[in-house]
Regions:
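Short C-terminal tail/terminal secondary-structure segment
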Residues: 2-5, 145, 224, 235-248
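Conserved glycine-rich cofactor-binding loop
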Residues: 20-21
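Substrate-binding pocket helix/loop in short-chain dehydrogenase/reductase
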Residues: 97-110, 204
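Active-site helix of classical SDR
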Residues: 121, 156, 164
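Residue(s) in the substrate-gating loop at a strand-loop-helix junction
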Residues: 140
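Short, small/polar-rich loop/turn modules that mediate ligand/substrate recognition or access, typified
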Residues: 172, 177, 234-236
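C-terminal helical subdomain
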Residues: 180, 199-234, 243
């Protein structure tokens, strides 16, 4: 391996689940910029439905609508490649207003944030194995601490850590490397409920040693590293990308 070429993904295929906006979209575009052919699974009917949506840039990316909360939809989902070199599972949801304290809301969040990860992972396993590919699962720093108003979010993200470790061990014999990323407070549409309030934002920044919000590009950099030959001897790990917030 030449280190200068380690982030060249030319000729490789990448699927980003939940890549229509936010962190997932940033990851998809980063792989495209590094030469990969990238396909996105999202929730809207077509790529054109994301035109003008904040944090969404599907230019140069393939797209399919897939409801990852529905196992039958995942089983039938189109993947336009014979094999996959990298799969990123970045789907996620959260409910505010104490919605996760209701049984229905709790189940909905866990289904998307945890159960669908296993559903999607099983769907792509046979396509990753021939390429000895990389599976990346996006968790959260919420896996390591209480998220007071969001019990389902915290529980599902903590469960993701166990899933990453277990799949990494189970699939290592297939040559599939499984790792995760735990982002902290990233400036996306999903976090606007907090970041649009100056006083609340200031309190949050006071807990981040780097004194800034993360950007989707910060998470994308971690994804490129973990999927590259630079990380060829790393499995079952979850890389924290949080500006140091877990240190305080």
């Amino acid at each position: 391996m030449g280190y200068g070429d380690a982030l060249d993904f030319s000729g490789l295929t990448v699927l980003v689940v939940g890549g229509s906006s936010g962190m997932g979209n940033g990851i998809g575009q980063a792989f495209r910029e590094c030469g990969a052919t990238v396909h996105i699974w999202g929730t809207r009917a077509g790529a054109e439905d994301y035109a003008g949506v904040e944090g969404s840039d599907l230019s140069g990316l393939g797209y399919s609508q897939v409801d990852v909360a529905d196992p039958s939809a995942v089983a039938a989902a189109m993947v336009p490649f014979e094999q996959l070199d990298v799969v990123v599972l970045s789907q996620g949801t959260v409910l505010y207003g104490r919605g996760e304290f209701q049984t229905e809301g709790f189940a909905r969040v866990v289904n998307v944030n945890l159960t669908s990860l296993m559903t999607c992972a099983m769907r792509v396993r046979a396509m990753l194995a021939p390429a000895r590919g990389s599976l990346l699962i996006i968790s959260s720093t919420g896996a390591f601490r209480s998220t007071k108003g969001n019990p389902a979010y915290a529980a599902s993200k903590a469960g993701t850590l166990g899933l990453i470790r277990t799949l990494a061990e189970a699939w290592a014999t297939d040559g599939i490397r499984v790792n995760g990323i735990a982002p902290g407070l990233i400036d996306t549409k999903m976090t606007e409920v907090s970041t649009k309030h100056p006083e609340r934002l200031r309190r949050m920044l006071d807990e981040i040693p780097l004194d800034r919000l993360g950007k989707p590009e910060d998470v994308a950099g971690a994804a490129l590293f973990l999927a590259s030959p630079l990380a060829s001897y790393i499995i079952g790990q979850t890389l924290v990308v949080d500006g140091g917030s877990l240190l305080s």
